[in-house]
């Protein structure tokens, strides 16, 4: 095993993983919101006049950016990231997958584009966002559990 990796404290490795995943989720979140605006459906204020679930989904950045800031300042913030990931997953799944009257079903992500390539790219962004949120939740949960076991 790499001696530098062995010497690095465990919390520092958790912090770096959470920071990387936080950046990943933020980038894919921005790409997904841009996709909503470009598609012109399931968008909302500030890009259209009406306030919609899209408008409220923009508040996720009020959770993501402080997490990134805390990580950059040297804090692990695992509980924060676990909360953010679970909120993000609940939001994304409820909007895209739950119920017959969901806000933005998958067919509206893919089928709106004239080109299958653009539709597929929009799906890749959505799947990347969901996988990033799952990875963030799992990593944050493991970091929380590791810190709990370390205290005993």
Segments the model singles out, each with a brief description of its role:
Residues 1-25, 145-147:
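Cytosolic juxtamembrane helix and N-cap/initiation of the first transmembrane helix
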Residues 18-28, 56, 82-88, 122-129:
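Hydrophobic alpha-helical transmembrane segments of polytopic
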Residues 21-52:
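Hydrophobic transmembrane helix segments
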Residues 26-36, 87-104:
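C-terminal TM-helix exit segments that contain a strictly Trp-centered aromatic cap at the helix terminus
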Residues 40-49, 95-122:
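Interfacial non-cytosolic loop connecting adjacent transmembrane helices
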Residues 56-67, 122-139:
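Hydrophobic cores of alpha-helical transmembrane segments in multi-pass inner/ER membrane proteins
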Residues 68-98:
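Loop-to-transmembrane helix junctions at the membrane interface
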Residues 136-152:
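Cytosolic juxtamembrane helix at the C-terminal end of the final transmembrane segment
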């Amino acid at each position: 095993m790499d001696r530098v990796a062995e010497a690095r404290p465990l919390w520092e490795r958790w912090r770096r993983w959470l920071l990387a995943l936080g950046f990943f989720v933020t980038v894919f979140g921005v790409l997904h919101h841009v996709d909503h605006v470009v598609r012109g459906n399931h968008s909302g204020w500030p890009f259209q006049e009406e306030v919609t679930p899209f408008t409220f989904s923009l508040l996720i950045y009020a959770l993501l950016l402080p997490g990134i800031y805390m990580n950059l300042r040297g804090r692990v913030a695992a509980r924060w990231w676990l909360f953010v990931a679970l909120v993000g997953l609940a939001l994304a799944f409820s909007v895209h997958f739950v119920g017959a009257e969901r806000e933005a079903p998958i067919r509206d992500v893919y089928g709106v584009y004239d080109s299958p390539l653009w539709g597929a790219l929009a799906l890749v962004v959505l799947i990347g966002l969901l996988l990033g949120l799952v990875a963030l939740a799992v990593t944050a949960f493991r970091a929380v559990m590791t810190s709990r076991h370390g205290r005993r």
